[in-house]
């Protein structure tokens, strides 16, 4: 070291020999061997410099200052990131301890092999690295087969990517990272890594090397994993400082050994790291060895460590503190959880590792180290129970996980949701099923309508007067609900009724023509009904005509009878007509079906019911009471006054003509023409 001090203090010529020696150590051919030698020589130099620095800080500063001047110069002259990083590493080590101007001139190493590049470096090692960039050479290979042009990059890679993995002993990454780190942990820093360590202790530089250092590693999770021993020492205070003060204290006070998180991380690390003496190692051994039963512990643990940094314990502590209020639910939770979760939620000491991992990824993993440190197995169990329930109760997360039923605010809702989960699907399906019911049951509706028209007719006895008084009798709609007495038909009646109301209000043509909707929905029925109509067209149609006419001019009783007969066949006939004519018009079928159910309601006068049976009937019905009001739209309906005459005449004399006309009207769905024929 003393020899270095004079060199640092002396002018550049002496320093050159030093540098040249380093260069000799690493010839510029830049072979893989040379590269490794170069790095090793660098580390050796740094190691020699730093070996004493632990004890002699000034000496270290001096040695750093030796590099420092070059670094200062490097910072100004170096355009390359690598050189800058290296220089910055050393510069930061001795940040301005020595004036950079002294050694700049003598120590410069220039990149002359590649003409465009004229970068200068204070150390031959840096130049060698730089040249590897030009050549693209990557002599340092990781056991994962990735290659790097710089050893420090390889080490960083190993520290980050292979933190929790076993690195083969022959791997450069292993020698560069863990071996040296363990030595460093023991305060032995023979190699260049030690220099970075001293710099790290100074905290001046953030280089990759410094990251590797235990001191800087405190700030970096990656290094934390790689350096479990030191982390155990240092992290506790850091964790305390980082913890949300009282909140973490609640969970961590009993656990003065907050470093539990580092132990958790250490678990992920191979045995030697765990083996390093620490108050936590015993528990770790339990979980590492006894916990070996749960292979996922190690893997899961590292994952948790990555997620939470080395604050796993802290996170758990928070949850413990927060959930304490939820402890009363602890008993509920095990019951509430699915059996698998219950086991994990209330694990035995042996079950802790797996239980923690599965029950709540964050808290469970953290709880291990904590309880291991400060609690007996029984206490740990109790705390875990309260803690798990508390997390589920206090935190909304369980809701997503399906544990929401057990959350305090959700406990009431949870059962509702549970049943609701079953009920809700039925609700939606209920709506859909309702439509399905309408579709499927509509074929059944015509029979239901038959009695309903009777009732409506009975109610209609006064209705004609109402119709005379006002075109739209909504009192009849009130009567209309009676027809839907059939369960499904009832709601359908309402739906169809609403549809019919809209259609009636919007278009007068509805009376003139059966709504095309009827045809579409009743297409199937219509086919059968058409056949029925063809088989018995005369009787049904005449009855319908008589029915409509009877309503117009005859007593309510006759009208009811005519209705009944007419409606039964008429509805079929009507369907037939919509089917024939409105197959294209089928879109309107729903309303027509509703008309068939409650024609009176659909039509203001309430004749909609008569309307669906047959369009002719609708025509006549609309003509009957509402005729006065709807005479404009229903001129053909006005003729129903003579129709009452035809009622007898048509039934008696024109039965044959009525049959033909009814068939024609049904096929063409031309109600006006049919009405005119009878008129």
Swiss-Prot record:
Residues 79-93 have a biased composition (Basic and acidic residues). Its main location: nucleus. Disruption phenotype: Results in increased resistance to the chitin synthesis inhibitor nikkomycin Z and causes increased damage to pulmonary epithelial cells and vascular endothelial cells, as well as increased pulmonary epithelial cell cytokine gene expression. Pfam families: zf-C2H2 (PF00096). SUPFAM superfamilies: beta-beta-alpha zinc fingers. Keywords: Metal-binding, Nucleus, Repeat, Transcription, Transcription regulation, Virulence, Zinc, Zinc-finger. Residues 1-15, 29-49, 401-410, 531-549, 569-591 have a biased composition (Polar residues). Residues 1-109, 168-244, 392-430, 443-466, 531-591 are annotated as: Disordered. A zinc finger (C2H2-type) spans 109-134, 140-162. This is C2H2 finger domain transcription factor dvrA.
């Amino acid at each position: 070291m003393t020899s270095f001090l004079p060199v640092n203090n002396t002018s550049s010529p002496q320093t050159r020999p030093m540098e040249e020696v380093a260069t000799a150590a690493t010839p510029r051919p830049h072979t893989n061997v040379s590269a490794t030698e170069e790095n090793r020589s660098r580390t050796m130099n740094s190691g020699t410099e730093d070996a004493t620095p632990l004890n002699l800080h000034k000496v270290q500063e001096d040695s750093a200052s030796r590099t420092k001047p070059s670094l200062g110069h490097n910072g100004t002259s170096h355009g390359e990131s690598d050189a800058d990083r290296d220089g910055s590493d050393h510069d930061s080590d001795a940040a301005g301890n020595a004036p950079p101007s002294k050694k700049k001139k003598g120590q410069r190493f220039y990149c002359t092999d590649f003409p465009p590049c004229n970068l200068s470096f204070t150390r031959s090692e840096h130049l060698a690295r730089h040249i590897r960039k030009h050549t693209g050479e990557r002599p340092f290979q990781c056991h994962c087969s990735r290659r790097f042009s710089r050893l420090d990059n390889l080490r960083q890679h190993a520290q980050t990517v292979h933190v929790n993995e076993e690195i083969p002993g022959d791997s450069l990454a292993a020698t560069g990272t863990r071996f040296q780190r363990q030595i460093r942990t023991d305060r032995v820093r023979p190699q260049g890594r030690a220099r970075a360590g001293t710099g790290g202790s100074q905290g001046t530089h953030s280089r990759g090397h410094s990251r590797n250092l235990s001191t800087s590693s405190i700030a970096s999770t990656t290094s934390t994993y790689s350096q479990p021993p030191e982390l155990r020492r240092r992290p506790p205070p850091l964790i305390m400082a980082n913890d949300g003060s009282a909140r973490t204290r609640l969970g961590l006070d009993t656990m003065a050994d907050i470093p539990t998180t580092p132990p958790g991380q250490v678990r992920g690390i191979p045995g030697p790291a765990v083996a390093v003496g620490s108050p936590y190692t015993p528990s770790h051994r339990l979980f590492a060895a006894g916990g070996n039963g749960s292979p996922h512990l190690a893997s899961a643990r590292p994952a948790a460590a990555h997620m939470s940094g080395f604050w796993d314990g802290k996170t758990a502590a928070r949850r413990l503190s927060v959930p304490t209020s939820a402890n009363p639910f602890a008993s509920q939770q095990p019951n509430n959880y699915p059996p698998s979760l219950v086991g994990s939620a209330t694990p035995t000491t042996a079950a802790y590792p797996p239980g923690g991992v599965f029950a709540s990824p964050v808290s469970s993993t953290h709880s291990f180290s904590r309880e291991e440190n400060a609690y007996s197995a029984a206490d740990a169990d109790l705390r875990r129970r309260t803690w798990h329930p508390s997390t589920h109760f206090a935190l909304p997360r369980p809701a997503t996980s399906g544990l929401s039923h057990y959350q305090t605010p959700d406990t009431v809702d949870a059962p509702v949701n549970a049943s609701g989960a079953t009920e809700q699907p039925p609700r939606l399906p209920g709506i859909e099923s309702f439509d399905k019911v309408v579709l499927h049951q509509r074929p059944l509706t015509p029979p239901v309508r038959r009695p309903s028209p009777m009732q409506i007719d009975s109610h209609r006895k006064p209705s004609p007067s109402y119709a005379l008084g006002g075109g739209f009798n909504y009192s009849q709609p009130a009567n209309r609900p009676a027809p839907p007495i059939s369960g499904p038909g009832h709601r359908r009646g309402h739906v169809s009724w609403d549809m019919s109301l809209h259609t009636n209000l919007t278009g007068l043509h509805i009376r003139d023509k059966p709504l095309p909707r009827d045809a579409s929905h009743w297409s199937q029925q219509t086919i059968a009904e058409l056949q029925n109509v063809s088989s018995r067209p005369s009787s049904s149609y005449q009855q319908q005509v008589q029915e409509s006419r009877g309503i117009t001019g005859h007593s309510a009783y006759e009208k009811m009878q005519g209705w009944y007969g007419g409606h039964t066949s008429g509805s079929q006939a009507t369907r037939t007509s919509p089917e024939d004519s409105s197959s294209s018009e089928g879109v309107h079928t729903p309303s027509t079906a509703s008309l068939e159910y409650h024609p009176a309601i659909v039509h203001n006068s309430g004749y909609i019911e008569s309307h669906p049976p047959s369009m002719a009937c609708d025509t006549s019905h609309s003509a009957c009471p509402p005729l006065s009001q709807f005479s404009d739209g229903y001129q053909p309906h006005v003729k129903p006054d003579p129709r009452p005459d035809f009622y007898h005449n048509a039934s008696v004399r024109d039965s044959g003509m009525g049959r033909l006309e009814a068939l024609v009207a049904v096929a063409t769905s031309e109600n006006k023409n049919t009405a005119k024929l009878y008129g």
